[in-house]
């Protein structure tokens, strides 16, 4: 196969790397030689010091000789240190030059790759011409002319185009197809994986970014690594590449790179600040690594270090994390300079048009720059347009997206069989289930708030899992492990029957649960039964996680069970050595359960994978599982049926139906419904129930296809035998089965007499009631009460009441002295003072009001009472003004007042700065008659290459119109302005980028205004000096023009 011309540059960079390495080795050898020489010199000096002096006359001569030798050695050592320091400096310079050369080469490729991109996309479908109108503008300009010459190009242009096509044909650009895997890939790639590699190569050669969305378990990691291996082997491109993935999968990425392509040098960029500093300085150096593997959090924290590099490929695993374009992660990833972006996801694209646009915008921001245009293009205007929308979606996604299912490509992979195993409740579970429904009877009967119903649902699901999840349910202390751990939960009884059968046939088991505390119970059970196990949950560290996976997967491992939390253990883990998956409870989102199942059902699996989904019969879990199946059925219709509006959360009616489901059966009996059936019989019944549910879902899918594309259609509403359950009188069910709680009876004394009974009936004399102690109201510092004085009055009142009560208790006793006087009651004046002090404070102001007041002060300044009052709910302007006055005088009474005042002053400084900016812009614009056309900015050295003068002029004028800080409005103004309709660079800028450019322009304007003011002052000063130099001429002129008689007359008047 012919190599690309770029390979020469890559090989030259390899030679340069080798030279740098050789120089580094020489430097290290020289350092060792110097160390050895200095060490030997020291030994000689020490030996000379220790040698005895035999002749007293010869000693001074030897001393002089040694002094000269020491000076000479010191001079040599000094020169060597200087030389080594210079070598270190040269080494750093070489590394920096290498980094700059590497970045320049990547940037040059980045500029070249876009040339054929639109052409390639337009070959796929003409739809991209709609999104990339700007690229067509140039061709329209070329087509200007008259008559038959309107659409012709010149002969030179035609020849140049032919030459380019010939060159592409000779070099095979864009036509590479590998028949065998790269030789540096260890192991054997499957046919569909090689096809996936060829698809990635085609994207690379056409300058296109893509989404690899194969189903989980098909080897997306291997396909990605093989692409980097292809670049290394056939193109001579060693990187640098960056892989950004969830923290839990970094260990797997490093292992897979070492396993499949050990020639690629991978660096794991993770750890505490000290470890990261070491990696930055010693490992993350140009020429020393090919792949940087890091987490989402590290990419954000260490973005400065990572931005030093221009990357060949940025690969994002679990790419659905960037579907929100406004998230910090998505913004950070857009900052990195890269030739190509590859997104990897195992979950299907959700049927949300905006999230789909966000991914496409990340891949091709210059083409998919406008979400509004994208939404308009796929807007469904009528029932007949549905098929057209589906076709448009398919055409847009085809060049970027590759998604294949196991059933389509991996014929040799054993099938996966799912069985729902239903089990009853124990007596203890029924008691708790009934108590939970009775506790929130009003909400369950009438339908409360969604949040309240969701909480009830969660509690009921905990009860279905194990009653010991509730505080105080487990007998103890002391807590013991025994059969009660099994018999008190139906699912544990089922698990205890199932595991011995699986152990007999040499199966290995993964048990998933959403609840970490349930994993604790399962851990106790496994220890009780003597089963060896591993465990991973959200609190498991990275090293411990990798060690557990390795211990479970190693050949001959005796670990029988692997306990995993569904969320933490469902990503990036290969546990194909297991062949049974037990879902102890089901997630609301069925995709999460699928991810969990695919830990075992993946490439490398030799056995049929059995999935057992536990379900508590006649309880909320039946409805949860049913809903999950419905959602999976709908997900299959997402793109193929053009359904663009997704129901993401459970609505209130669904929750109510789930909570009520099975209530009648729970209340009708107290006894346990756990049967003694054999496990084989339970599995057979489960298979029947699963088949019935599959049939129901098939009918539901058929019904859903017939629905119109109408917002009012409820995809979760279908014909169901239990549809009328919401109409049951739930209150009646509870009252019919209600058992009054037993009354608390007084225990009988062991041997009681009639006299004692009679005495008891007569009763003891009533004790005097405890005095009602006045409770001091809770006084907060922000309410500005006189707390010190109120506390004094309160304590005085309490002392008097307690003293009075003590007197009453002791007045009938004998030989007991009366206590000393404890104080007097509050006087009328003190009572009035107390009431007045309570009214002086702001008792109606809550902590929330106080925080709102502080935020408003930061936003508007302490003096803008009207604006502050507009932010306060339930407070009049007069109340706010009164509070602001007291706050200004007594703010030092507040806890942490320094921080509060600093925040307010910082906000006021921002307001002041904003006013200064608006004045500076206004002053600048006042110097022009039409600033929208005439405004000029003195750039100096800050012109920049990205923004032109027309863009800067528009930006300044819009800030003057909209106000400083309204960046989203400024961004919208650029997007809607006809002036910039073809300027995709400006239209694709984020609000933060526009803000940074505005700040740069404002600094230039302020500097220009200062220079203008200085010139104005200088001009006024010169004018004033000129005026002061000319006045003497005016009187002389007037005096010369006056007649002698008028002069004589003025003299006469002055004498008078």
From Swiss-Prot:
Gene knockout outcome: Reduced heat stress (HS) memory. Premature decline of expression of HSA32, HSP18.2, HSP21, HSP22 and HSP101 after HS in the double mutant plants chr11-1 and chr17-1. No visible phenotype under normal growth conditions, but the double mutant plants chr11-1 and chr17-1 are very small and display early flowering and sterility.
Function: Possesses intrinsic ATP-dependent nucleosome-remodeling activity. Constitutes the catalytic subunit of several complexes capable of forming ordered nucleosome arrays on chromatin. Involved in the formation of nucleosome distribution patterns. Involved in nuclear proliferation during megagametogenesis and cell expansion in the sporophyte. Required for the maintenance of the plant vegetative phase.
CDD domains xref list: DEXHc_SMARCA1_SMARCA5, SANT, SF2_C_SNF
Family statement: Belongs to the SNF2/RAD54 helicase family. ISWI subfamily.
Biased composition (Basic residues): 141-151, 1047-1056
Subunit annotation: Interacts with RLT1 and RLT2. Interacts (via C-terminus) with RLT1 (via the DDT domain), RLT2 (via the DDT domain), PTM (via the DDT domain) and DDR4 (via the DDT domain). Binds to FGT1.
Additional information: Plants silencing CHR11 display reduced plant height and small cotyledonary embryos with limited cell expansion. Plants silencing CHR11 specifically at the onset of female gametogenesis (megagametogenesis) have defective female gametophytes arrested before the completion of the mitotic haploid nuclear divisions.
Name of the protein in its database record: ISWI chromatin-remodeling complex ATPase CHR11
EC id: 3.6.4.-
Low complexity: bias regions: 1-10
Helicase ATP-binding domain location: 201-366
Listed Acidic residues bias regions: 11-32, 60-73, 155-169, 815-833
Highest taxon of source: Eukaryota
Domain Helicase C-terminal: 494-645
GO cellular component assignments: nucleus
Main location: nucleus
InterPro entries: Helicase_ATP-bd, Helicase_C-like, Homeodomain-like_sf, Isw1/2_DEXHc, ISWI_HAND-dom, ISWI_HAND-dom_sf, P-loop_NTPase, SANT/Myb
Residues engaged in binding ATP: 214-221
Domain SANT: 840-892, 941-1002
Native source species: Arabidopsis thaliana (Mouse-ear cress)
Region of interest (Disordered), ranges: 1-80, 133-175, 738-774, 814-833, 1011-1056
């Amino acid at each position: 196969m012919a190599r690309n011309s770029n390979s020469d540059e890559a090989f030259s960079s390899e030679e340069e790397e080798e030279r740098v390495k050789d120089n580094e080795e020489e430097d290290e050898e020289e350092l060792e030689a110097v160390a050895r020489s200095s060490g030997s010199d020291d030994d000689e000096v020490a030996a000379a010091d220790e040698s005895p002096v035999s002749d007293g006359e010869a000693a001074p001569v030897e001393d002089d000789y040694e002094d000269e030798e020491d000076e000479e050695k010191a001079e040599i050592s000094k020169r060597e240190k200087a030389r080594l320091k210079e070598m270190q400096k040269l080494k750093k310079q070489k590394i920096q030059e290498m980094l700059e050369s590497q970045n320049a080469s990547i940037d040059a490729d980045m500029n070249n790759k876009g040339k054929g991109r639109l052409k390639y996309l337009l070959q796929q479908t003409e739809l991209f011409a709609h999104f990339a109108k700007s690229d067509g503008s140039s061709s329209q300009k070329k087509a200007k002319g008259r008559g038959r010459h309107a659409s012709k190009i010149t002969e030179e242009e035609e020849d140049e185009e032919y030459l380019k096509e010939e060159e592409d044909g000779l070099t095979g650009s864009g036509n590479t197809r590998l028949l065998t895997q790269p030789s540096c890939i260890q192991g054997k790639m499957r046919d569909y994986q090689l096809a996936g590699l060829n698809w990635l190569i085609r994207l690379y050669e056409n300058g296109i970014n893509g989404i690899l969305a194969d189903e989980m378990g098909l080897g997306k990691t291997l396909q990605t690594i093989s692409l980097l291996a292809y670049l290394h082997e056939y193109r001579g491109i060693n990187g640098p590449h960056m892989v950004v993935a969830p923290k839990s999968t970094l260990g797997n990425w490093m292992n897979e790179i070492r396993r499949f392509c050990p020639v690629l040098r991978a660096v794991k960029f993770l750890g505490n600040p000290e470890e990261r500093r070491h990696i930055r300085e010693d490992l993350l150096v140009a020429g020393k690594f090919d792949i940087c593997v890091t987490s989402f959090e590290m990419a954000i924290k260490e973005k400065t270090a990572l931005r030093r590099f221009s990357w060949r490929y940025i690969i994002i695993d679990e790419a659905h994390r960037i579907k929100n374009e406004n998230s910090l992660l998505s913004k950070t990833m857009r900052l990195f300079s890269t030739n190509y972006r590859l997104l990897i996801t195992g979950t299907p694209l959700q049927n949300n048009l905006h999230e789909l646009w966000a991914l496409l915008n990340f891949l091709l921001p210059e083409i998919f720059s406008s979400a509004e245009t994208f939404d308009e293009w796929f807007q469904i205007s009528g029932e007949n347009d549905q098929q057209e929308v589906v076709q448009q979606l398919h055409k847009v996604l085809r060049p970027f997206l590759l998604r294949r299912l196991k059933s389509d490509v991996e014929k040799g992979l054993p099938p996966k069989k799912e069985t729902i195993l239903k089990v009853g409740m124990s007596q203890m579970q029924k008691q708790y289930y009934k108590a939970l429904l009775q506790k929130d009877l009003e909400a369950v009967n009438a339908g409360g708030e969604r949040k309240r119903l969701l909480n009830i649902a969660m509690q009921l699901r905990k009860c279905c899992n194990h009653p010991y999840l509730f505080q105080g349910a487990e007998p103890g202390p002391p807590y013991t492990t025994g059969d009660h751990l099994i018999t008190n939960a139906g699912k544990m009884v089922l698990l205890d029957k199932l595991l011995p059968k699986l152990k007999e046939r040499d199966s290995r088991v993964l048990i998933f649960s959403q609840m970490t505390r349930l994993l604790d119970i399962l851990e106790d059970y496994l220890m009780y039964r003597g089963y060896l196990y591993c465990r991973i949950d959200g609190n498991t560290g990275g090293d411990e996680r990798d060690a557990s996976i390795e211990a479970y997967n190693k050949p001959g491992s005796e670990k029988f069970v692997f306990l995993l939390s569904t969320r933490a253990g469902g990503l990036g883990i290969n546990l194909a050595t297991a062949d049974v998956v037990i879902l102890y409870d089901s997630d609301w989102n069925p995709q999460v359960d699928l991810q969990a199942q695919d830990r075992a059902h993946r490439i490398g699996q030799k056995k049929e994978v059995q999935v057992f989904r536990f379900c508590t019969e006649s309880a909320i879990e039946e409805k949860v599982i049913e809903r999950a199946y419905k959602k999976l059925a709908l997900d299959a219709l997402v793109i193929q049926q053009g359904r663009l509006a997704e129901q993401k959360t459970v609505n209130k009616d669904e929750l109510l139906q789930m909570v009520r489901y099975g209530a009648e059966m729970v209340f009708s009996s107290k006894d346990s419904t756990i049967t003694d059936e054999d496990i084989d019989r339970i599995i057979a019944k489960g298979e029947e129930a699963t088949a019935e549910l599959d049939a129901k879902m098939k009918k539901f899918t058929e019904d859903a296809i017939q629905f119109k594309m109408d917002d009012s259609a409820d995809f979760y509403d279908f014909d169901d035998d239990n549809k009328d359950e919401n109409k049951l009188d739930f209150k009646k069910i509870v009252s019919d089965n209600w058992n009054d709680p037993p009354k608390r009876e007084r225990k009988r004394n062991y041997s009681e007499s009639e006299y004692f009974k009679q005495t008891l009936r007569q009763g003891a004399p009533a004790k005097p009631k405890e005095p009602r102690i006045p409770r001091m109201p809770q006084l907060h510092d922000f309410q500005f009460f006189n707390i010190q004085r109120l506390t004094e009055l309160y304590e005085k009142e309490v002392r008097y009441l307690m003293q009075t009560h003590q007197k009453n208790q002791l007045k009938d006793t004998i030989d007991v002295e009366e206590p000393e006087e404890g104080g007097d009651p509050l006087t009328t004046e003190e009572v009035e003072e107390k009431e007045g002090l309570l009214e002086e404070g702001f008792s109606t102001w809550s902590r929330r009001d106080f925080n709102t007041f502080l935020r408003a002060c930061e936003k508007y300044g302490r003096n803008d009472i009207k604006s502050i009052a507009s932010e306060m709910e339930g407070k009049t302007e007069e109340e706010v003004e009164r509070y602001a006055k007291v706050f200004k005088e007594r703010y030092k009474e507040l806890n942490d007042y320094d921080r509060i005042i600093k925040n307010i002053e910082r906000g006021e400084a921002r307001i002041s700065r904003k006013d200064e900016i608006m004045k500076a812009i206004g002053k600048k614009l006042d110097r022009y008659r039409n600033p929208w056309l005439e405004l000029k900015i003195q750039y100096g050295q800050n012109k920049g290459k990205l923004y032109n003068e027309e863009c800067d002029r528009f930006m300044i004028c819009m800030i003057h119109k909209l106000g400083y800080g309204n960046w989203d409005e400024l961004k919208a103004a650029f997007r809607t302005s006809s002036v910039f309709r073809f300027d995709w660079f400006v239209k694709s800028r984020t609000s933060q980028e526009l803000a940074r450019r505005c700040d740069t322009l404002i600094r230039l304007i302020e500097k220009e205004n200062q220079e203008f003011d200085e010139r104005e002052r200088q001009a006024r000063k010169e004018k004033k000096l000129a005026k002061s130099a000319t006045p003497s001429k005016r009187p002389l002129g007037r005096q010369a023009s006056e007649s002698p008689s008028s002069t004589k007359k003025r003299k006469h008047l002055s004498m008078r």
